[in-house]
Amino acid sequence: MKKYFVYIASAVLMMAACAKEDINTPVETPVVGETEFISIELNPATRTILDGTNTNWSAGDAVGVYFKNESIGTLTLVEGSTNKFEGEIESALLLGQDKVTLKYPADVTAVPTTQVAVAGSFANGAALLEGSVRLKDLRAGEGVTLNNETALLQFKTPVAGDVAFTIGTTTYTVTGCAANTTYYACVDPAVSGKLSYTVGLALGGKEKASFSTEANKVYDLGALTLKESMFGVIGNTGDWGDKADIKMYETTGDNFYVAYGVEVTSGFKVRKAGVWDNNYNFGTTSATAKSANSVVGVYTDGGSTDINVTNGTYDIYFDRLAGQVYIMTPGNSHKVATQPTAPGNYSLAGSFNGGGWDDTVAMKYSGDGIWTNVQNFAANNEFKIKIKGSWNSSWGADNVSPGSELVSNSGGNAKVKAAGTYIVGFYKDGNKITLVKK
């Protein structure tokens, strides 16, 4: 992708009058404890609201005055004015020849890593300006230029959410972005390295192995893309037979996927690659409609029930390893959903475990009568499922494949023919054990 940039107008502080230095001016003596009132006009109006490539001051803006990195005062935008700043500075022990530094924002020394989204602009106070001037020139009305110390990343996101850009080891997050709207992220030009991004939990579809910026430039990243997974949502989002699966995106989590803004009418399932393969056909056990912000236990089997939900628009998360689907109000994190309470204690025991058959591994309760566990098996390892850690209630199967029927309580050992890491699913009431490679 070509790199496009435009220059941001620098903020120039102009005084109303200029005073010429008299070459016979006597040597100045600093006055201990001296403070003085400064009133300046910043022309043209500059800085915090982006309008094309021009920027303007906004209510509440303040410029900090520093001497040798120590704050000596603040000049604040006068209420009702567009360019007049006033305030007291501590000029004790300072000479007119001493240089002071003006910084905007007054109390910010680094580009903030969390910035609130502003449509067509960037967060108030996120772009830094800095310039130096002799104290005598500031008093006399000589000009000072504030240089833009930040770079801007221009972007649009395909879905609503928080957009986080990582450059090297530093991450800048723009919160509350709407879909298909132009935003700007402020970044420190000193930061460089690999560029990647996320939207919510979804991984960005493009990366740059090496990325750097310069102050006072805008870098147009264009319309961001997201990394599509092999999984999708299919069902009463339209016509089961004719409508294409709604793509789920890969996320920062292992085997964890998300589809944003899915409009659902009644039921749906999650499947892989747009085909009905029993290894990757995820449904649940109950036809009862779920409400928003619910967690649904799922397992992979052609005979599973559709995931029914109250009609609406949702962000749908799929945790394949835990056997769970989250049905969330758009914008809500899946973490706010309440996890289901397990009605019992289920565990795996078998020859896969170094501790032997009496050493058990707990299974996670997914919800809706389903338990799961991710386990490494060697070829021909065997296992059974124990209830409450007792061999009095243990379940096995003569053959383990998607939708295998359980033999019975105290049935035969389930054998895994090929070595690998597997997701074990157990649906007791439906007499099902499922085994699918991770």
Annotated model-derived regions:
Residues K2-I8:
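Sec-dependent signal peptide recognition
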Residues M15-A17:
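C-terminal motif of bacterial Sec signal peptides marking the signal peptidase cleavage site
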Residues A19-A45, D51-N56, G143-V144, N148-T150, ...:
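Insoluble glucan recognition modules
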Residues P26-P158, D220, D301:
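Short, low-hydrophobicity acidic/polar segments
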Residues N69-N83, T169-A179, T213, D245-T251, ...:
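Solvent-exposed serine/threonine-rich low-complexity stretches and specific carbohydrate-binding patches
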Residues K84-I89, T170-A185, D254-Y257, G367-T372, ...:
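Short, solvent-exposed S/T- and G/P-enriched segments that are highly enriched in secreted/extracellular
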Residues F85-V100, T182-K194, Y257-F268, N373-F383:
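Short Pro-Gly-centered beta-turn/loop motif in secreted/extracellular proteins
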Residues V163-Y219:
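Contiguous ligand/interfacial binding patches
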